[in-house]
Amino acid sequence: IVGLQVDAEQFGGQQMTVNYHIRGRIIQVPSNYDPEKRTYSGIWDGSLKPAYSNNPAWCLWDMLTHPRYGMGKRLGAADVDKWALYAIGQYCDQRVPDGFGGTEPRMTFNAYLSQQRKAWDVLSDFCSAMRCMPVWNGQTLTFVQDRPSDVVWPYTNSDVVVDDNGVGFRYSFSALKDR
């Protein structure tokens, strides 16, 4: 709650516009995470602590597990892969050039949810802020992030099997109206 008392003559009798920068909610973050410095110390034991953070991974964790405004009545903490979110959160907190000679976190998330929407739509929006996709692996909701990684398997021309007709690839597709 904010209250202001100002003299109208200071603004020439015009209506004053006031804007506020709010930090948002206190959410659960890893116990070895310093949200002010955006650093992780030591090995994480899986425990969480309350703190403010605009790291998209921990905002997503909050939205998925909070019972009042999130999906916490349907999903418990055991149903969400916090270890995948931990790796994603570390990637989001890496410092990158800001274009002005300084650095900034790779990804931040400052959302204000003002209307009720379908859970999947909100989940997709949160995930798109950090270039990841939600995946149900049969036991938990986990996440796969699009980020640079080591080569898993190199494919070269020698890996392509050519049939007797000299064709290496056969392309097939469905009609556009059937998709």
Located regions from the model:
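Hydrophobic or amphipathic alpha-helical targeting/insertion segments
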Residues: 128-144, 149-154
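Polar, S/T/G-rich
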Residues: 1-130, 137
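Residues in flexible loops and secondary-structure boundaries
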Residues: 28-30, 35, 117, 121, ...
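Generic recognition of flexible, low-complexity loop/linker segments
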Residues: 121-124, 131-132, 169-175
